[in-house]
């Protein structure tokens, strides 16, 4: 098709609206204990349509025109709740961190298409036979929930011990295997601190 035909007969429209936001709050219960909460969201919607005029050079099925509409929705929501305790007893320092998090992703999509209209250039899904129409829709949901913790201890900044662990549950895995745990243990010795005493 020549450029003038495309400009006047073939129309495409596309629109996207997006919203993102974050919220966080922290409370100091004491000088050694605090709690925090964070939430974030990312959401957008995309809608587009496409018209092809009758009599163009497109395939035979579209000689009487084609019209399509597509809509896509996306939403991602995350939350994080944490608490931290930091205390010292004599030469020993202790730190305990516990938390939980969620990640929730959802999508929706709808698609409608009609072609070879009964009345050329009248763009309506009702203007095509069932054989010349196609409607489809889909939806998906994914959720990840986790709990985690870390314990740290040291003696005179010389001996250090760290124990941590996290367990996640994923909705995309088979029911019997949705939970998975990964622990970690580490330690260290800074012998040079002994010479500072």
Tell what function each PLM region has:
Residues 1-5, 50-66, 108-135:
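Surface-exposed loop/turn segments flanking beta-strands in extracellular/periplasmic regions
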Residues 3-50, 68-88, 95, 105-109, ...:
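Outer-membrane beta-barrel transmembrane strands
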Residues 100, 166-171:
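Conserved short loop/turn motifs at secondary-structure junctions
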Residues 101-105, 190:
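Short glycine-rich beta-strand segments
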Residues 118, 181-189:
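Feature captures outer-membrane beta-barrel proteins of Gram-negative bacteria and organelles
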Residues 126, 176, 182-184:
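Outer-membrane beta-barrel domain signature, especially the mid-to-C-terminal portions
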Residues 171-177:
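Solvent-exposed loop/turn segments connecting transmembrane beta-strands
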Residues 194-197:
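Outer-membrane beta-barrel translocator/channel fold
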């Amino acid at each position: 098709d020549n450029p003038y035909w495309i400009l006047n007969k073939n129309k495409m429209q596309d629109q996207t609206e997006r919203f993102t936001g974050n919220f966080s709050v922290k409370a100091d219960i004491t000088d050694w204990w605090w709690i925090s909460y964070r939430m974030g969201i990312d959401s957008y919607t995309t809608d587009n349509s496409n018209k092809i005029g009758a009599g163009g050079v497109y395939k035979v099925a579209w000689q009487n025109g084609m019209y399509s509409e597509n809509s896509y929705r996306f939403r991602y929501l995350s939350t994080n709740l944490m608490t931290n305790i930091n205390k010292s007893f004599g030469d020993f320092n202790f730190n305990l961190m516990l938390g939980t998090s969620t990640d929730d992703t959802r999508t929706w999509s709808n698609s409608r298409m009609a072609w070879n209209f009964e009345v050329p250039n009248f763009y309506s899904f009702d203007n095509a036979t069932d054989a010349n129409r196609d409607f489809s829709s889909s939806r998906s949901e994914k959720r990840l929930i986790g709990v985690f913790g870390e314990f740290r201890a040291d003696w005179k900044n010389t001996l250090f011990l760290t124990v941590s662990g996290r367990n996640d549950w994923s909705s995309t895995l088979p029911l019997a295997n949705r939970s998975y745990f990964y622990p970690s243990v580490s330690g260290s010795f800074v012998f040079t601190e002994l010479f500072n005493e």
